[in-house]
Amino acid sequence: MCGLNVFVSSRPAAGPPDPATRAAFAAALETMHHRGPDDTRVEFGDGVAFGFKRLAIIDREHAAQPMHYHDRWTVVFNGEIYNYRRLRLELIREHGATFATEGDSEVLAAAFHYWGVGALPRLRGMFAFVAYDTWTGTVHAARDPFGIKPLYLLETVDGLFLASERKALAPFSGPDRGALDTDALAHYLSFQFVPEPMTLHRQVRRLPPGHRLTWTPGGGLRLERYFRPSLRPLHVRPEEAHAVIRDALRDSVRHHLNAEVPVGAFLSGGVDSSAIVALASEVKPDLHVFSAGFAHDGYSEIEVAQDTANQLGVRLTPTVVTEDDVIRELPRIVQLLDDPIADPSLIPLYFLAQTASRYVTVALSGEGSDELFGGYAIYREPASLAGIGRLPAGLKRGLRGLAHTLPEGMRGRSFLQRGTTAIEERYYGNARIFSPDEKADLMRFTAEPHTAVTAHLYAETADVDDVASMQYVDLHTWLPGDILVKSDRLSMAHSLELRVPFLDQAVYAAAAGLPTELKLPARGRATKHALREAMRGIVPESVRERRKLGFPTPTRIWLKGAIGDWVAGLMAGSGARSLLDLEYAQRLLADHRAGRADHSRKVWTVAMFCLWYAIFVDGTIRPAGSWSPSRPRAIIEA
C-alpha cells in the first residue's frame, strides 16, 4: 500500500515542469509520507510528473515505482493484486510477456499493456492506479470495485492532477476558503460523511469505485463504469449457500495473507473479525491479533476479544483509549481524513492501527461484511413496518400528520413517521444525522436535498425488496464514503496496510444472490444469518451467536465531560459560523449536557466540521505530527 501523485500537462510540448512546479509537486508528495516510508521517488518528463511513496510488501527489493513497461507505459499503483501470480502465468502463456521483478505492480503494467481495459475484471484485489501511455499522451486510471483504495482528481487549465489523498492536491487546487462545496457540506450533515465522488473542495473529486477514466490533452476527461454491484436474490438451498460462502471466504483470507512482511488481524469478538481470524489461523497459527476499547464501563470490546482469542488460540494485544488520548489526537485524525467524517468509531480505529503497526505491517479486518450479508439492525425495519405499510394511503397520510404533532421523543412518534414514509425518503444510509427540517434551521445556505445522492440508487433497485435496496444504498454511500475512507486513512497514518477479505470479488458473488430470508430470518433478531451459519464449526458458538457490537464509542458520555468543554470552546470560536448557525448547535449541546435529550450524534457532527474548518480553512489549529512540506525529505529523482 502506498501513496501516489501524478501530473500530466495540457501542454506537453512545453517540456518538463519548471523548478517551482517540481518543488511544489515533491512537497505535495511529502504530505503522504505516512503512506509509504520505505521509498520515495519522483520522475519528471515532458509535461508529466510522477511521485510515489512506497510501503514495501511484495518483492521489497526490486519492485520500486513508478514502473515502466515496454518503453510505453509508466504506471503508479496503490494497493494489492492478490491473483498476480496467476495473471503473470496467463500473460506469459498468452503473449510471451517478460518480467524483471516478482511483484504485482509489473504484472498490472503488463496486463494493461496486453489486455487494455479488459484487464480490470481480471484483477482480484484492492487498487487505485494511473497508467500513462507515452506513445499517445493518454492517461488511464482505475479504482477497485468497492473503493477500498482512494484516488482524487483535479482538472485545471494546466492539466490533470491525481493523488491518493486530497491534501496532496492542495498546492494546485488552491485553498478551501472560497472553494467550499456547500452541497457537499449539506450532504455531510445528513450522512455524517461527504458522499463520493464529492469532496468539500468543489474543484476536487474522487474517482468513483468500479470506474475508470481516460484523459488526453485537449480531449478532456471521460469516465466509464466497469463494475456495478448487484443484489438480485436467487433461489438457493441454504446449505449450498452456506458452503459457497465458507469456501469463498476461506480462499479470500488465504490470498489476503500473502506478504513478505508480518501480517496480523483486528479482532473485536464479533462474527466478522472472528471469522477472518479463525480462517487465517488455519494457515498462520501464530497469528497476532489486536483489539481496542475505552476506559469506560460498557465501552470496551477487549474482554470479549480476549475470550475469543483464547478460544481460537491466537495472541491478542489490546489498546485502551482515554479521553486525554482523544483530545490530543483528534485534530490529527481529522486532518488525515481530508474531509470530515463524524463517525466516532474512527477514534478507536486510529489507536488500534497505531498499536498494530508496532508489531505488523499488514492487518486483516472485517469491513464490508455488514453491507454484503445484511449486518445492520436497521435492515430489519421493513419487516417491522410491513403492517402499517399495508394501510390505505389516506389513513397513512393522516397518521403521518398526527406523528408530526406528537412531542419529540414521545414513544411511537418515530414509528409512525417512518412507517408512513416511503423508503426512498426515510432511508438514506446507516447514519441519518440531521433531518431536512433540522438542516434548514442549521444551515445559512441553501443546497440540494439528500435525495440527490440516493434517488438514482433507488431507481436502480426498483425491482428488488426494500432490504436489498437499503444494502445497495449502503454499498454506494456508507461503505465507500465512511467505512473505507476511515479504514484507509487511519491505518496508513501509521504505515499499516489494512486488507479487507470480505470485499473480495468471490465473497461478493457468494453474497449477491442471497435472498433476504437467508440474511434476516423472520424469527429472532439475528442479522447476517447466512454468514453465521457458514461459520458454524469454524468460530466458537458463543461468537457465532453474539449480536453485532461495532466499535462502541462513549460520545454521549464524553460530551458531558472534558471533551464537551473542548467542543463548546471549539464552536464558540469557530469561523464556520458563516456557514452554520452555531448558536443552534450550542443549544443542542446544552440540552445534551443537561440530560434533556441525547443529541450526541448531531453535536459530534457539527463539532467535527468546526474542527475541520479550523484546520483546513482558518488554519487556527495545526495538528501535532503534521508534516511541513517546506523542506522535502530525501528523494530519488529520475
At which residue positions do the language-model features occur?
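Adenosyl-5′-phosphate
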Residues: 1-4, 19, 27, 174-177, ...
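Short clusters of hydrophobic/aromatic residues that line enzyme substrate/ligand-binding pockets
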Residues: 42, 64-67, 99, 123, ...
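Short, basic, helix/turn surface patches
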Residues: 130, 341-353, 392-398, 573, ...
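Active-site adenylate/phosphate-handling loop in enzymes that bind or generate adenylated species
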Residues: 145, 157, 351-409, 461, ...
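Short low-complexity, flexible loop/linker segments enriched in glycine and/or proline
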Residues: 331-335, 379-381, 558-560
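Alpha-helical subdomain
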Residues: 335, 404-408, 422-426
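Active-site proximal helix-loop segment of RNase H-like, two-metal nucleases, encompassing DDE(D)
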Residues: 336-340, 568
